[in-house]
């Protein structure tokens, strides 16, 4: 059984979700790192790094699935998102974890059957696939979707090699 950490990076809210990939796939934990608006970017990035490093130390995932940056109309927003991803990647690399990156559309396709699925559809499918009583917060659901997408690609390596999964 492989423990997978999914991360949905954001400069204000970073979602995380950890699953054990088995039969059935099982939720370990999920949540969000909420970063104060009044904090500067450097402080928020430090909190992302520290929060994920603590989560990794506590739950000992073996692999990481990280959502790739999507093209954003606002360059400043895209740069901040890129910085948040960098803080998340650094926490994972410092822990010696292999990281697979997936495009948002690839994650949605794997979880909801459509690369254009909305957040409600993704949340519903995450809840159904993990047999949860309630839906996780949006950012945590997106992180769990990344982890589930990675679990799917792990079980179908040829598919992963041909659909854009990057390690």
Swiss-Prot record:
Xref: InterPro entries: RNaseH-like_sf, RNaseH_sf, X-over_junc_endoDNase_Mg_BS, X-over_junc_endoDNase_RuvC
Where's it found, cell-wise?
Answer: Cytoplasm
**SUPFAM superfamilies this protein is in?**
Ribonuclease H-like (SSF53098)
Pfam families named in the record: RuvC
GO MF annotation list: crossover junction DNA endonuclease activity; DNA binding; magnesium ion binding
Q: Where does Mg(2+) 2 bind?
A: 67
Q: Sorted alphabetically, which keywords does the UniProt record give?
A: Cytoplasm, DNA damage, DNA recombination, DNA repair, DNA-binding, Endonuclease, Hydrolase, Magnesium, Metal-binding, Nuclease
Q: How is the cofactor bound?
A: Binds 2 Mg(2+) ion per subunit.
What biological process terms from GO does the record include?
A: DNA recombination; DNA repair
Which reaction(s) are listed as its catalytic activity? Endonucleolytic cleavage at a junction such as a reciprocal single-stranded crossover between two homologous DNA duplexes (Holliday junction)
Q: Which PROSITE patterns does this entry report, sorted A to Z?
A: RUVC (PS01321)
* Any Gene Ontology CC annotation: Holliday junction resolvase complex
Give the residues annotated as active site: 8, 67, 139
This enzyme's EC code(s):
3.1.21.10
The coenzyme or cofactor needed here is: Mg(2+)
Gene3D superfamilies (alphabetical): Ribonuclease H-like superfamily/Ribonuclease H (3.30.420.10)
Its subunit composition reads: Homodimer which binds Holliday junction (HJ) DNA. The HJ becomes 2-fold symmetrical on binding to RuvC with unstacked arms; it has a different conformation from HJ DNA in complex with RuvA. In the full resolvosome a probable DNA-RuvA(4)-RuvB(12)-RuvC(2) complex forms which resolves the HJ.
Function comment: The RuvA-RuvB-RuvC complex processes Holliday junction (HJ) DNA during genetic recombination and DNA repair. Endonuclease that resolves HJ intermediates. Cleaves cruciform DNA by making single-stranded nicks across the HJ at symmetrical positions within the homologous arms, yielding a 5'-phosphate and a 3'-hydroxyl group; requires a central core of homology in the junction. The consensus cleavage sequence is 5'-(A/T)TT(C/G)-3'. Cleavage occurs on the 3'-side of the TT dinucleotide at the point of strand exchange.
Among PANTHER family, the record links this protein to:
CROSSOVER JUNCTION ENDODEOXYRIBONUCLEASE RUVC (PTHR30194:SF3)
Q: Which family does it belong to?
A: Belongs to the RuvC family.
* Name listed for the protein in its UniProt record: Crossover junction endodeoxyribonuclease RuvC
Q: Which organism is it from?
A: Halorhodospira halophila (strain DSM 244 / SL1) (Ectothiorhodospira halophila (strain DSM 244 / SL1))
What gene codes for this chain?
ruvC
């Amino acid at each position: 059984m492989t423990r997978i950490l999914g991360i949905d990076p954001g400069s204000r809210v970073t979602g995380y979700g950890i699953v054990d990939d088995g039969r059935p796939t099982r939720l370990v934990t999920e949540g969000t790192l909420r970063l104060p608006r009044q904090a500067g970017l450097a402080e928020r990035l430090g909190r992302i790094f520290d929060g994920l490093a603590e989560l990794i130390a506590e739950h000992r995932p073996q692999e990481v699935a990280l959502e790739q940056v999507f093209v954003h109309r606002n360059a400043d927003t895209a740069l901040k998102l890129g910085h948040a991803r960098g803080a998340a990647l650094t926490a994972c690399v410092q822990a010696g974890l292999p990281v697979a990156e997936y495009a948002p559309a690839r994650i949605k396709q794997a979880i909801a059957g459509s690369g254009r699925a909305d957040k409600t559809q993704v949340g519903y499918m995450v809840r159904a696939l993990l047999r949860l009583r309630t839906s996780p917060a949006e950012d945590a659901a997106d992180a769990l979707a990344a982890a589930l997408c990675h679990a799917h690609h792990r079980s179908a390596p040829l598919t992963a090699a041909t659909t854009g999964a990057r390690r």
